[in-house]
């Protein structure tokens, strides 16, 4: 189930209950609605953590890049609600970078977990190069960017996937919300507004 402890009995996309049993049989749950079960370990990141920690829920890393560096294909990196300024590279890994909104069933965490420009301004989130093609970013917001090109998200020569993201309140002469160059990025259930 998506999150049984809080009463979310929708099935995950790769649940063994899908297409099983006899048609017409009620099993007491809803259709698929929340994505696949994460197959790899889950790494946590919190700005109050430390990169010498093990990346667990109680002992998170301080930086996203540290979590990426220790991850392998299929892993998930979960960000605690906070503002993130970090430049990252996914190093050709097929990983998911997400907020804890799905884990805890609190959709507001998408707004509370966001990338913003650093103290000197600029874009909120930049990915450059094909080493970022296999990444999935979901349940995160990008806001407050002020720059010439790509206030919110800048994707250059890479094509990652964005799911359930909010890109808002960014300013740029070109691509206020999103600036793509050499990219075939995929955006699903994305809100792009007030840019």
Protein language model regions, located:
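Bulky hydrophobic/aromatic "packing anchor" residues in well-ordered structure
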Residues: 1, 11, 17-19, 45, ...
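C-terminal accessory segments
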Residues: 1-35, 122, 129
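Right-handed parallel beta-helix/beta-solenoid
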Residues: 1-6, 34-66, 70
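Glycine-rich beta-solenoid repeat tracts in large extracellular/virion proteins
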Residues: 3, 87-90, 123-130, 151-157, ...
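N-terminal extracellular ligand-recognition/capping segment immediately after the signal peptide
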Residues: 7, 73-96, 100-105
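Hydrophobic strand positions within the blades of repeat-based beta-sheet folds
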Residues: 19, 153, 162-165, 178, ...
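Right-handed parallel beta-helix/beta-spiral solenoid domain characteristic of secreted/periplasmic
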Residues: 94-146
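Right-handed parallel beta-helix
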Residues: 98-99, 111-112, 133-144, 159-171, ...
